[in-house]
Amino acid sequence: MNRSCAMKSCVLILLLALLCAERAQGLNCYNCTMIPFGNTCSSTATCPYPDGVCTIQVAEVVVSSVRLKVKSNLCLPGCPKSPQTPEVLGTVVHVNTDCCNTDLCNAAGPTGGSTWTMAGVLLFILGSVLLQTLL
């Protein structure tokens, strides 16, 4: 019995160490700059920043009633605030940024929220209502 308990403890400690260990290799991100929105980025790179994040930035500008929209898939040292509206040569540029921290997670463009996020929020609300009803 004592040996079985020690074995279970060793396995538990090993699992915890694996879960808490930092990744040995850096974060992999898609890496493309200023490509037309709608085009796919296929180039990848290992993020050089220890606490870096993968990002996708979509920049949009209207010049003489012509709308230009480009995107960049990058690794950055941190997640910039979004949205941003810098002014370049007297023209306002709208920039939206999404950040993530898993390998190749910056493939898609910024969205209004994922279906899974909305489903999670809905389940949380329903669970809260049910819990209040039971109490």
Curated annotation (Swiss-Prot):
<dbReference type="GO" id="GO:0030550">
    <property type="term" value="F:acetylcholine receptor inhibitor activity"/>
</dbReference>
<dbReference type="InterPro" id="IPR045860">
    <property type="entry name" value="Snake_toxin-like_sf"/>
</dbReference>
<feature type="lipid moiety-binding region" description="GPI-anchor amidated glycine">
    <location>
        <position position="113"/>
    </location>
</feature>
<feature type="disulfide bond">
    <location>
        <begin position="32"/>
        <end position="41"/>
    </location>
</feature>
<keyword id="KW-0336">GPI-anchor</keyword>
<feature type="signal peptide">
    <location>
        <begin position="1"/>
        <end position="26"/>
    </location>
</feature>
<feature type="disulfide bond">
    <location>
        <begin position="47"/>
        <end position="75"/>
    </location>
</feature>
<protein>
    <recommendedName>
        <fullName>Lymphocyte antigen 6B</fullName>
    </recommendedName>
</protein>
<keyword id="KW-1003">Cell membrane</keyword>
<feature type="disulfide bond">
    <location>
        <begin position="29"/>
        <end position="54"/>
    </location>
</feature>
<dbReference type="GO" id="GO:0098552">
    <property type="term" value="C:side of membrane"/>
</dbReference>
<feature type="disulfide bond">
    <location>
        <begin position="100"/>
        <end position="105"/>
    </location>
</feature>
<dbReference type="InterPro" id="IPR051445">
    <property type="entry name" value="LY6H/LY6L_nAChR_modulators"/>
</dbReference>
<dbReference type="GO" id="GO:0045202">
    <property type="term" value="C:synapse"/>
</dbReference>
<dbReference type="GO" id="GO:0095500">
    <property type="term" value="P:acetylcholine receptor signaling pathway"/>
</dbReference>
<keyword id="KW-0472">Membrane</keyword>
<dbReference type="InterPro" id="IPR016054">
    <property type="entry name" value="LY6_UPA_recep-like"/>
</dbReference>
<feature type="disulfide bond">
    <location>
        <begin position="79"/>
        <end position="99"/>
    </location>
</feature>
<keyword id="KW-1015">Disulfide bond</keyword>
<dbReference type="GO" id="GO:0033130">
    <property type="term" value="F:acetylcholine receptor binding"/>
</dbReference>
<keyword id="KW-0732">Signal</keyword>
<feature type="propeptide" description="Removed in mature form">
    <location>
        <begin position="114"/>
        <end position="135"/>
    </location>
</feature>
<keyword id="KW-0449">Lipoprotein</keyword>
<dbReference type="GO" id="GO:0005886">
    <property type="term" value="C:plasma membrane"/>
</dbReference>
<feature type="domain" description="UPAR/Ly6">
    <location>
        <begin position="27"/>
        <end position="119"/>
    </location>
</feature>
<dbReference type="Pfam" id="PF00021">
    <property type="entry name" value="UPAR_LY6"/>
</dbReference>
<keyword id="KW-0325">Glycoprotein</keyword>
